[in-house]
């Protein structure tokens, strides 16, 4: 599907951070059924995985906001990393079934949620630009990892 700016987007997690910023740039609708492109942005347990499968059944173009958190070995229980890893695997499975789905595995994005993290962070605007780059690609992009 060739991207054009008039396409309708359904974005989860629009109250703050990246999801909120994306709504400033993209034409949005209030539900999955009406959209052309689903941006799966809100982390809420395993719900991102469930929404990914729902969007795939509706033949939507999908961008999942993942994390580089599943990378590496954790020395303590880290459910967030497990949930984001499940999103990675579901994306991979559906991609190879022909679904136009991509997972963007960001490192820290400079939002209030991670204001106390003392690590390098990318700007929200830069993260938006990464998503726009994916949208403009003429071919499917399976995954992309971006760390500051």
List where the protein language model places each region:
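N-terminal Rossmann NAD(P)H-binding glycine-rich loop of SDR-like oxidoreductase domains
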Residues: 9-25
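C-terminal helical subdomain
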Residues: 116-148
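Structural signature of the Rossmann-like NAD(P)-dependent dehydrogenase/reductase core
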Residues: 11-12, 39-41, 61-67, 102-105
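Conserved Rossmann-fold SDR core element
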Residues: 95-109, 140-143
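Catalytic loop of short-chain dehydrogenase/reductase
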Residues: 61-96, 107-114
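Short acidic low-complexity segments
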Residues: 27-36
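NAD(P)-cofactor binding segment of oxidoreductase domains
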Residues: 38-62
């Amino acid at each position: 599907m060739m991207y054009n700016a008039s396409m309708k987007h359904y974005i989860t997690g629009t109250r703050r951070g990246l999801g909120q910023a994306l709504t400033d740039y993209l034409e949005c609708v209030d539900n999955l059924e009406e959209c052309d492109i689903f941006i799966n942005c809100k982390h809420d347990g395993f719900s991102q995985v469930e929404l990914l499968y729902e969007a795939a059944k509706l033949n939507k173009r999908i961008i999942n906001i993942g994390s580089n958190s599943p990378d590496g070995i954790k020395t303590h229980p880290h459910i967030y990393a497990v949930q984001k890893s499940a999103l990675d695997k579901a994306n991979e499975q559906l991609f190879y079934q022909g679904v136009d789905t991509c997972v963007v595995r960001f490192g820290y994005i400079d939002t209030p949620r991670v204001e106390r993290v003392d690590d390098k962070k990318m700007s929200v605007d830069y993260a938006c630009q990464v998503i726009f780059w994916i949208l403009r690609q003429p071919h499917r992009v399976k995954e992309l990892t971006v760390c500051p």
